[in-house]
Structure formats: C-alpha cells, structure tokens
A protein has these predicted regions:
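C-terminal effector/interaction modules appended to NTPase cores
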Residues: 1-86
C-alpha cells in the first residue's frame, strides 16, 4: 500500500473510492484499488490517493512514477509515501 500524487488525464466520469485500474510501474503491471483522499477525482484533477495492489506486493521507492489506465481512463502519478507491510 502506498500514497501517491496523481493527475487524471482522461476519465468518462469520476474516480471514486474503490476504483480499480491497472497500474504500470517500471516492469510491473498490476490491478490496484484507489482511495482518493478527497473522496473523488474528476478529469484534469490533481490529488492524493492511497493505492493498494490487488494480488501481489511490489518493491517501490518514493519518487517513482507510474501510469494507470482502465478502458478510456488514463492518468499518471508519483509515489509519495510507502506503508510498511503488515
């Protein structure tokens, strides 16, 4: 689980708590759940999101950049904080 600053480039509606795109980070591509700090993000919004990979953990570093997508939805982000596994 990690925190990230994201920018929503395109999305047909709103990104809400529980949104599940595929996150592409380095060589990893994994489904993840998004939990926006503000409750929702609209296209063009920039915000803080808590992200959790659905199936397996990955090694992350603060500052890494990633892309997320699902259908027509696309966005980019930067890892800002990492929660310890537990």
């Amino acid at each position: 689980e990690f925190e990230a600053d994201v920018v929503v480039l395109n999305h047909p509606t709103r990104i809400r708590d529980g949104y599940e795109p595929v996150v592409h980070l380095e060589t990893a591509s994994e489904a993840a759940t998004f939990h926006p700090a503000s409750g929702q993000l609209l296209p063009g919004d920039r915000g803080s999101v808590r992200i959790r990979f659905k199936f397996r953990p990955y090694l992350l570093e603060v500052g890494q950049r990633f892309v997320f997508r699902e259908g027509q939805s696309k966005g980019v982000g930067t890892v800002t904080d990492i929660s310890p596994a537990g």
